[in-house]
Amino acid sequence: MKRIYLILIAAVAITFTSCSDRDMDTVKPDTGQGAPIINLPEGASQGKIMVKFKPEAASFLDAAVTRSIGGAMTRSGISDMDIILQRIGTHKLERIFPIDNRTEERTRKAGLNLWYVIHFDEDTNLEQVAKDLSQVADVAKVQFSHIIQRSYDPNVRATVLTKQAMSHVMRNTRAINVTPDDTYFNLQWGCKNDGSILQNEDKNDKGDKVVPAVTGVDVNCGEAWKLCTGDPSIIVAVLDEGVMYDHPDLKGNMWVNEAETFASKEDADGNGYAGDRYGYNFTDDKGYISYDDPNDTGHGTHVAGIISAVRNNGEGISGIAGGDKASNIGGVKIMSCQVFSGSKGCNLYQEAKAVKYAADNLSLIHISEPT
């Protein structure tokens, strides 16, 4: 547990201090004596800014959070801070990482309870807001919040093999001695590649010749499966587009928060996230995981399938750690932490929330985005 939380702290720190090389610069306050301002205002989200308070401000903030229960928090209880919050038209001041009594002690020990995001009038000059906030004595850091976009182009669709090429694939791999009986396992050259899957004469649906397979260029699943086919005690959080949680080849290996009702507006388990049965949609801040927006690419579901599509169930594909249904062995569990939705990306603070959510649930993390 201690090791996992140290990794979490490092991951969140990286999230809060990186977006691109351009954003690594720091804007210095005019006086040179204020809190550091991280990133640059160009391209940052308007009407949003992140602030980390100093530890001595915690009691004021805690009292403000308590007073705001049932409504939006708009003031901090710190006089100098509240003057600025009123001037910029603040309509919400929220703790980035919501209170969860099960993990709150660790959250405070890491200082993550001191991070807040301010939502204010979008017409207000963002750079000036940052400079003003940096002069508040109880502020330790100010950071512009940029949008994180996908590292893959949603307008580029994968080309598929022609029926003739697929027939060739199935015909030439049928004799391979493999365990899974999944319908399309023979097409998964990444799992087992004997060099016969694609030939020089094979073409895709656009008539282009495909690159022929190379023997042995795979992840050696055969040898790995002799040792382990999956372990349901392991949770993998997929930070990507939403995962199709009801897909017939995935639903058996989805992580399930039994205390919650999917997409409910009630936070039944008190972790700060309502309706998070299969994970959470951090882009839209709700428990409803979406995967069918016209601008979605299906990448989140694709990744989840590679990791843990139910193996040996007579349909679909074989997940690398999807277990073995025929032997009643479960696969690793997939948690959907949605950080992309249609054409939308998430803010830095939203991704930080996703990372912490995954860590609080003892998950391994897979992230698909720019490095």
Which functions belong to the PLM regions below?
Residues 20-23:
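Bacterial signal peptide processing site
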Residues 102-117, 134-235, 243-249, 253, ...:
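Protease zymogen maturation seam
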Residues 212, 218, 222-348:
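Subtilisin-like serine protease catalytic core
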Residues 362-371:
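Residue-level detector of conserved catalytic or cofactor/ligand-binding positions
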